């Protein structure tokens, strides 16, 4: 079985990931669980051959030099895949994350009116956060797709690598891949401010300079979407502020309080009948939240989110209870993801 056949099989099974690891048979992750494919174990040379088969010369050199590399790969008629190739104790390994060829709409994903309001904002910072594999890219792709169908904007994305491919409809969309089209997130963001964008998507806000430039872009009249690997809205604020040195923290809190539109922290939960759905914690940049950010009272944010339901805010547990009430998720699976399991 060649790599294209393996990836086609993986996509047909509804897998989020295909795992290749020397010394073991191929495995897939379906609905959050890793399962073995009924194939013989692959040795190092077989795994390496499968990986090298889809790499270009630059990617092979990068892999051999750094012992790991990231890239994306298309299987026409099947899907697009985000690939991480690496080495492990038994030899070569790789993980192929499935990126659906069709961008799901906000309606299909069950994203409510509050998400449309975020997307319709003329300027500000929207952060979508969560652990790896929590559906952040899917959520952001739906929001970009909504803009593409309803606004006449210039949308600039900076990604590592490009995941969902957007065709320009009403919007002009330029997608830039780090290490292919630009040297780094920070370099691309610095240029972005001179490229007449209305909307900027930053695939990952992973360092001080990128975060600083994203805040500046939001402050200077752009709608900026970004991701972080934090697990709650409050932790997201802490993470951003903590990146900066002590003498800049007050300034950063002030910038955040002025520009923050929303923090959406999400996790994927198993659905009744198969598949997974995102549960969201939603914190909006209300005057109360802005004051808490400015005054460094992050601990009080949770109660502000709880009491802001009429505005569209919700804690993760409120989001999980809503999914249970709608019959989409069982109490048991909601309890596994809840911050306060006793509430279920």
Describe the function of each predicted region:
Residues 1-344:
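Short, flexible helix-loop junctions that flank or precede catalytic/ligand sites
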